[in-house]
Amino acid sequence: MVASDDPRLARKVRRLGRLDMPGGGQVVVEGDYAYVGHLNPPYGTSIIDVSEPRKPRIVSRVMLDGEDTHTHKVRVIGDLMFTNYEMYNRYYFRRGDNIHEYTAKLEGELGRPPSDAELAHALTEDLYVGGKKKVLTEADIPILRAARERGYHDGGFKIYDISDKTEPKLIKHQRTHAWGSHRFDVDENYIYVSTEWEGYVGNILVIYDIADPARPAYVSHWALPGQHIAGGETPTWNADDNRVHHGMRHGDQIWVGALWGGFYVVDVSDITQPR
């Protein structure tokens, strides 16, 4: 957070208060409270009393176990708080999925098992983390091997009871697939989740009924043309470069942002058959 009163930073805007806290990915404000989804574990979600803007105060925090997950998106509907649950540093750890493939490829080229340094060089191709080129070293290879063996099984979203803002209570951890949910929209009836899904490449849009928050029920899903590889489709892009980033519902439409691919307007007048 910027802690400067330099008038050149903004026009007709002045800072009333500030908090020194870990960085956030999404901030939403409902009534007297702000909800911050933090970017980096172990910090999950903070609930902040902003009834006195000059004196904001943290009333509770949801902390995460371990370093495998981040929950940087948050939304609130009434007394329910929703957060994503997504594999942290996923582009980096995903390279571990390719270790066996690259080991076999290099062994064929070299006529011997590759060293960790050679594997790191091969796996570095087209690897970007946080928008920056990531160069792997031989020290990364044991980490990636361990992550591959460990796997990731927690991806999805969580629903909390926040009727008492000082003590959020977990209602449900809904697992989706693979690295889990990135961003989402939600209303009183449904949650619209961007998540990986069995049989598809990259994130697609998946809709759940949340009438009973303790038992979210799958309703339907929608994907970009070319994502359904299990159904015989072939993407025209590399890996998961194009995918559903998130959708926002407006009336009977969901406006879906496609990463590096523009946007789509999806008709959900029949929620069971998005088109």
Identify the meaning behind each predicted range.
Residues M1-R275:
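Feature marking well-ordered beta-strand scaffolds used for ligand recognition
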